[in-house]
Amino acid sequence: MPKIVDHAQRRDEIALVACRVVAEHGFDGASMVRIARAAGYTTGMLAHYFDTKQDIIIAALRLILRRIDERLTQPVAARARPDLLALLTEALPVDEHRRTECAFWTAFWGQVSTDKRLKRINSWVHREYLRVFERCLTQCWPECSQWSPAKREQVLRSLVTFINGLTASAVANERDWPAARQIEQLRLQVQLLHAWAKGSARASVTRQAAGA
C-alpha cells in the first residue's frame, strides 16, 4: 500500500524547521533552499506545500502561537488555581526550545514595518496573543473580573509589553539574561502590576463610598 502522508503534519514540520533556520541565520538568511535542505527536502518538494518563503514564515508564526497557547492553557486545566508567573514563563526564552521560538519571533518583528502582508499578519498575531494572555489573567486572578474594562486592558497590555521587551533583551543578550534572571524580573513585574491593580481598585471603592 502507498504510504499515507499527513500533509498538515508535514507543513508543521517544515514550519518548525523554518523557525530554527530563521533563529540561526536570520530572516534574510533563511532562503527556501536553506529551509528545504534543513528539512531534508528538495526545493520542489517544499514548493508543493508553500509557494513562497513568506508563506512558510506565516505558517511558522501560526505554529508558534498555537504551541504557546497549548503550553499556557494545559496547565490551567490541570490545576484549580494556576500560578500566573509559571504560565507567563512559558512565553519566555528560558530554555533552548523556547529560545528558538523567541529568536524567530524577534526576527519577524524586524520585518513587519516594511512588509504590508506581514504587518497584517502581525496585527492578527498580536490580537491572538492578547487573547491567550487575557485568558491566563482571568484564570489566575479571578478578581480581575471586578476591575473596570480599562484597568483589565491596561494590566494585560502592560504584561504583554513587558514580556515582549524581556524576550527581545534575552534573545539579543543571552549571557546577560539567564532563565533565573528573566523569571525574577517577570515576578517583580507581576507583583507590581497586581499591587497597583488591587490598590487602584480599593481607591475606586473608597471614592464610590465617599460619593454615596
What are these regions (language model features)?
Residues 52, 111-116:
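Short loop-to-helix capping motifs
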Residues 119-123, 141-212:
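Hydrophobic/aromatic-rich alpha-helical bundle segments in the mid-to-C-terminal region
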